[in-house]
């Protein structure tokens, strides 16, 4: 069995007039993330980690931000397509460990819903998805609530 590890990172700016999609769910917040798609930083970080582990470049390569078909797309669709892409090389997901950095909104109560939604999209157990939330203690762009970032590490194995 061949086991590979991948790492992903994403960041988007918080702006007024956008919905806040994070971890595949819609959160109530006065600002949302700016991007070509729905700008779900957690899903994007997971996609990049999966693609990296399979040595298949990155999310921007497969789903370019200048392509009209991805304008305002639900990032869960991109995640499903990413899982299908890595499957073409014989890989399946072992587990995911992710961290979201945001001052607000507080995410603790939303993590189980994120795990469930993402597990359904990827066809894995929610128990195989660890999501943690942290702040930057009011430091940097995240601390000033100018943006949200996410990091993801994945383990994939060849079936």
Swiss-Prot record:
Q: Which domain of life is it from?
A: Bacteria
> Quaternary arrangement and interactors, per the entry?
Homotrimer.
Pathway the protein contributes to? Isoprenoid biosynthesis; isopentenyl diphosphate biosynthesis via DXP pathway; isopentenyl diphosphate from 1-deoxy-D-xylulose 5-phosphate: step 4/6
Task: Please state the Enzyme Commission number of this protein.
Answer: 4.6.1.12
Enzyme class label: lyase
Q: Which positions does UniProt annotate for a divalent metal cation binding?
A: 10, 12, 44
Q: What PROSITE patterns would the database entry show?
A: ISPF
What is the protein's given name?
2-C-methyl-D-erythritol 2,4-cyclodiphosphate synthase
Site annotated as Transition state stabilizer: where?
A: 36, 135
Q: Which NCBIfam families match?
A: ispF (TIGR00151)
Q: Key word Metal-binding present in the record?
A: yes
Q: Which reaction does it catalyse?
A: 4-CDP-2-C-methyl-D-erythritol 2-phosphate = 2-C-methyl-D-erythritol 2,4-cyclic diphosphate + CMP
Function per UniProt: Involved in the biosynthesis of isopentenyl diphosphate (IPP) and dimethylallyl diphosphate (DMAPP), two major building blocks of isoprenoid compounds. Catalyzes the conversion of 4-diphosphocytidyl-2-C-methyl-D-erythritol 2-phosphate (CDP-ME2P) to 2-C-methyl-D-erythritol 2,4-cyclodiphosphate (ME-CPP) with a corresponding release of cytidine 5-monophosphate (CMP).
Please list the residues that bind 4-CDP-2-C-methyl-D-erythritol 2-phosphate. Answer: 10-12, 36-37, 58-60, 134-137, 141, 144
Cofactor(s) the protein needs: a divalent metal cation
The record describes how the cofactor is bound as: Binds 1 divalent metal cation per subunit.
**Protein family:** Belongs to the IspF family.
Keyword list, A-Z? Isoprene biosynthesis, Lyase, Metal-binding
Q: Does the keyword Zinc feature in the UniProt annotation?
A: no
One biological process GO term for this chain? terpenoid biosynthetic process
* GO MF: 2-C-methyl-D-erythritol 2,4-cyclodiphosphate synthase activity; metal ion binding
């Amino acid at each position: 069995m061949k086991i590979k590890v991948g790492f992903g990172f994403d960041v988007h700016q918080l702006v007024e007039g956008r919905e806040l999609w994070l971890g595949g769910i819609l959160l109530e917040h006065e600002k949302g993330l700016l991007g070509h798609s729905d700008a779900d930083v957690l899903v994007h970080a997971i996609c990049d980690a999966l693609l990296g582990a399979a040595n298949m470049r990155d999310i921007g390569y497969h789903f370019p931000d200048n392509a009209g078909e991805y304008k305002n797309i639900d990032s869960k669709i991109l995640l499903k397509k990413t899982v299908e892409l890595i499957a073409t090389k014989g890989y399946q997901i072992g587990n995911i460990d992710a961290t979201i950095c945001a001052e607000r909104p507080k995410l603790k109560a939303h993590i189980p819903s994120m795990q469930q939604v993402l597990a359904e999209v990827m066809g894995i157990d929610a128990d195989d998805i660890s999501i943690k939330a942290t702040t930057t203690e009011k430091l940097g762009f995240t601390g000033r609530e100018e943006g949200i970032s996410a990091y993801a590490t994945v383990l994939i194995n060849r079936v």
